[in-house]
From Swiss-Prot:
GO terms for cellular component: mitochondrion. The active site is at Y166 (proton acceptor). Its EC number is 1.3.1.124. Substrate binds at R57, F116, S124, R218. The keyword Nucleus does not apply. Belongs to the short-chain dehydrogenases/reductases (SDR) family. 2,4-dienoyl-CoA reductase subfamily. This is Probable 2,4-dienoyl-CoA reductase decr-1.2 [(3E)-enoyl-CoA-producing]. Auxiliary enzyme of beta-oxidation. It participates in the metabolism of unsaturated fatty enoyl-CoA esters having double bonds in both even- and odd-numbered positions. Catalyzes the NADP-dependent reduction of 2,4-dienoyl-CoA to yield trans-3-enoyl-CoA. It comes from the Eukaryota. One of its GO terms (biological process) is fatty acid beta-oxidation.
């Protein structure tokens, strides 16, 4: 049963938890930083006086987000184009970042992702591969590009990846994402044991239900407000989370206050993983027929503007 008075017992705090100037002099890279959770993470680091780089494929959105963050925080936020699926483009982006700032990032947040709901028997190999390429291979590309440069330069870094509870529990209808996120979590723990000798540490944050237009628009066929309202009753705390809560946790574990935290997977979900297998996918999806899936696919593609894979 969900809490009936979450505002009293589980209030949402959106202001930065660390002191002002906590990341002064630090260079932070956030992939997928143009929208949603990534934007909130970038904004929080900028509030805390880090020099922030946001990276994604679409420059137009990135440039607007960078302007917004700079205006809101008075800090520094720079956009860099990066298709994380392309190792060459990732390397080029790091070259440009190094050229502009004279160093590679001391903090990396792997937030770029892709996901959608689909009955697995209707899932094409191309669609499956697209998510693997973005989430698993893309995270590997960015992480190892930074890691190799840090090793060569003898500089340390904190790397945090955004994953999901269903990476461990599994989940229906989002198999490509579950497989990819599980790989990212295993990579996180593996590199924590291999690369700490070089001054690198690795952790992952696994958010629960966080309503964002990008992620939830690809996972649900209903309206955002309706979906969030339903999700409240599927969470022990009786509410959904906010991007700012994820951002505060990421900032905290990226700070020197948490330098002994390494190889950890931290769930931030109000207890969701123990309530609904961490997937946020209701049992109602099991009753859908092919017509329901076709209608949902067309609606979701209309939101993202993408052709069928």
């Amino acid at each position: 049963m969900a809490c009936k008075n979450p505002k009293k017992f589980f209030p949402i705090r959106k202001s930065p938890v660390l002191r002002d100037g906590a990341f002064k002099g630090k260079l932070v890279l956030v992939t997928g930083g143009g929208t949603g959770i990534g934007k909130a993470i970038a904004t929080t680091f900028a509030h805390l006086r880090a020099t922030v780089v946001i990276a994604a494929r679409r420059m137009e959105k990135l440039e607007q987000t960078a302007r917004d963050i700079t205006k809101i925080t008075g800090g520094t936020c720079e956009p860099f184009q990066m298709d994380i699926k392309d190792p060459g483009m990732v390397s080029d982006a790091f070259d440009k970042i190094d050229m502009k700032f004279g160093k590679v990032p001391e903090i990396l947040v792997n937030n770029a992702a892709g996901n959608f709901i689909m009955a697995t028997e209707l899932l094409s190999s191309n669609a499956y591969g697209t998510i693997i390429d973005i989430v698993l291979k893309g995270t590997f590309n960015v992480t190892t590009e930074l890691g190799k440069r840090c090793i060569q330069n003898k500089t340390g870094a904190s790397i945090t990846s955004i994953t999901a509870g269903y990476a461990r529990a599994g989940a229906p209808f989002i198999v490509p994402s579950a497989v990819s996120k599980a790989g990212v979590e295993t990579m996180t723990k593996s590199l924590a044991t291999e690369w700490s000798k070089y001054g690198l540490r690795f952790n992952a944050v696994s958010p629960g239900p966080i309503p964002t237009k990008g992620a939830w628009g690809r996972l649900n066929s209903g309206e955002m407000g309706d979906i969030a309202e339903k999700m409240k009753f599927l969470n022990p705390e009786g509410r959904v989370g906010s991007p700012e809560e994820v951002a505060n946790l990421v900032a905290f574990i990226s700070s020197d206050h948490m330098s002994f935290l390494n190889g950890a997977i931290i769930d931030l979900d109000g207890g969701q993983q123990h309530f609904n297998h961490g997937s946020h996918m209701g049992d109602f999806l099991h009753s859908w027929d092919h017509k329901n899936w076709e209608d949902a696919e067309n609606l979701i593609r209309g939101r993202t503007g993408k052709e069928k894979a």
